[in-house]
């Protein structure tokens, strides 16, 4: 099956695909030049809800890649999109999170509040406290919908793993006895948002990621074509063992693009 015949656009994960531990994976300026030369539209889609979009743009610029803000989506934006569908006019929400989440919600008309909130929205918050846990628990038990940015329980740093958004969601879930609606991968929210931006059908869009349980599972659920790269957390053995197999397994993003 010649993927190159049908693919019109790309949804690219960032961590483990474009960089690892802040170091670029491959010659990024050349890779993105090739993506644009081949005429692919693309969106960078990440579960990271902590950084703001300008911070992502700045980081990519440091690595020699110029990206427009409308070429990036993250799970904070997917959470705001989910809320907007339910509460079109915006309003007060209880937020457990950092600037990336607060800013994404503000764009859609939602602002942080402590009382009479429409929903509880939670993600990674490196200043998480018992008091925040208690407030989130209170609002959810009073009937506020509980939305989580992404389920990643940990994320890698050079010397190991640290707690991610999923660990905070797990604490709130344990206290409130309520599971969150997840906005990020592998739930469809983030891909849905990316497809809206791209304007292409799932079958002609290739999702490229390094994590089977989020990037590949999520992409397959949405009917996207999928490419698993071995430049992040997945080993060749894990890739071979996973079924249903992705459309492509490649060493890195450069190889994916060369095969399209």
Describe the function of each predicted region:
Residues 2-14, 19-38, 49-73, 80-260:
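Asp-based, Mg2+/Mn2+-dependent phosphohydrolase catalytic module
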